[in-house]
């Protein structure tokens, strides 16, 4: 009846319409996800009337229907894509729960005395937030698919979280009194970049709601926005291209694309487990303290466990851990220092030793049970990176502790018991390596201790950790190269392994860029904030670029220009100068020609 050409055009039109409809639904999902976050921020951030609550609830109901009927339409329009997704069964459960919410709405739905309404309210928020996170995480993969540079995707994701956090902190229910946008932006940047520098008192400025926002910003910034969103995207979507996986592989510094999802899962799992155990230990240490000192001990423990493991340095106490009644709790200081070390040592190192322990324990179990099974033998379970990090970390901790003790024994450590001197010295060697907590008055330290702290801040933590700085591996490679230059040796060999020249070039680039930024930022701050001394400004800038959070009582003196410079420095320190510049500068293709060599006098 119809010609072949007509049927072809008709089928082509149907495919185009179906594709356009599915694309429109996805756009609606993204808009609904953003609307969910906005409505939740409005409901929890403002004191709204009953009429306002009714409008908010109606808005949530509309969003529920968009997600529900949009998902149903997608299933009918493109069933293959749905059933191929890894997390399709979770989405089906969520759809069923959304249908339950829709069907259980009653005329008394807006009554605050209705238990069903309260249940619906909580369930609605949890479900909508869960779905919104899934769909917004998909945007990360979409960005990679559209050939946006992975470095810039990393940068944009941090910018988005920082701006979102700033607006959330400005909500009326998030703070007491007035809070300017620049102060909110500075605090949000400090939290997301896990720095800890503050221009306002966290304890007195922010309400519990505001401190919860800070906690979430620290957590997201600590594990990395890309880590979190990539895990969600890879969990629920299978349509990730080779380029997507290569981009994630480079961001995570993985040797194989097969390990991407496992690395993401282990990172999140390790973070949750360590922080949960740490929170319980911290609660146990403070359980007998007066409620007037710490009203909510559980929240204190959770907040400081997350802040310590993420190397953020934020505290809910005025004066940080130097607060009266807390400064003498040496057990608490040691446990917080342990969390800082675990967070700053790097996830690959934790995984490396986890693999070693698993290997040893399982082989021991097989021997004890008489089994002939054995774990496959690995030549080097503990790789070179792990050996460098562990060695450098031990040297910095032991050396830093001894030098601080020697320098401050007759100053800030005077009058303390032996265990107090040891605890304070150890903590003061740990915290400059990007944590930012303080158990002493930094302004009372001797100049020699300031410069020791400055050096520890600049070196920082280890690669792929929650800490900042130029990293322990970078300084190790640079020092090894200096030694080789003095000895006239070309090859860089560490722990019986030869390092590629790319490692050496990158290490020197990181060091040079760090010094250039510190020098430039110090000059700019000195120009705009002339009230500060050179030592204060240099200390502040180094603390910001290394995402530490220690200050010689200078942060509160910053004016608007100074806050912007330090905020930018914190941001650059978190995303990395190499990462930022690699994303901004166009890459040059390799050339097939070679110039003649000529020595230059150095």
What are the residue ranges of the model-derived segments?
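Membrane-proximal intracellular helices of multi-pass ion channels
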Residues: 1-602
